[in-house]
């Protein structure tokens, strides 16, 4: 953890979490909530989860950041909360550093989420890169992701022990698969929150480069790394596309090169700049946002992704959608003429 010179950042007054939430994240959550038995599983697992006990585990085994311990992380949390104009939470999430050489971070909890960074991550990143990570995790907390992340972790640990859940093991596996899909999309949302917190795309890309390589920035190149991400997303035939789907089936996070490429795509779309300039969803208008709007945005997002994709499955989905749309138009016109 090293110190970088201070820089000015735009305070994002009244920003809604909708500003950084990836449409596919919201759409996956809408689909998840529609799954048969989801409410029963959520209720059952929530009853098994003792938030106080989990917090006590970290209180007893890790180090809580405050003015005296990891003061830089404590300061970063306060600054990130100010930048993201954190809404009226009861209090900021507690932040813990746990002894673990593997770089990682997570936000846990149901009613009072808290953040855990591993010592390996703190050692790997400089202060500005840690600002991105803290913003990423606070974004999870503000978006309400911690509830579903906690649910996924508990279900994974309970895999094979599902007789107590009314819908049975098969239904639970479907929910776990849907949670994995949502989790990967939620990471794209949180990356956007992290970028809005640091307001420096180069810093965000460096984090993913370090996570992929273990460090050694002198041997890395941002342009080449982003090109690598594009190659992974776009290259290959149908076999590679299927393999990529299988590779991430049980992953909670997209690969680092994919996350960097997706963040680059968001910056290039102009949306990031519009948010900084004031053209963004406001928290005060959240009550007017509807679930159907989230579903429509998700559908539009997937459609645009397929249209732009060079991946075999993406091209197939886009072409199939176009064919079905044309067929529907032809059938509609045929029936209209017959009825005339």
Q: Where are each of the predicted segments found?
A:
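Catalytic Zn2+-binding segment of zinc metalloproteases
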Residues: 138-157
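Short hydrophobic membrane-inserting alpha-helices and related fusion/pore-forming segments
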Residues: 156-172
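Extracytoplasmic and endomembrane cell-envelope/extracellular-matrix remodeling and assembly machinery
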Residues: 209-244, 249, 262-294
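Divalent metal-coordination and catalytic microenvironments
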Residues: 77, 117, 136, 190, ...
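Active-site His/Glu-centered metal-binding helix of metallohydrolases
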Residues: 125, 134-143, 189, 193
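Hydrophobic or amphipathic, alpha-helical segments that drive membrane association/targeting
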Residues: 1-111, 273-340
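Short helix/loop segments within enzyme catalytic domains
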Residues: 68-74, 80-88, 167-234
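Short pre-active-site segment immediately N-terminal to the catalytic Zn-binding motif
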Residues: 66-68, 116-132, 178-184
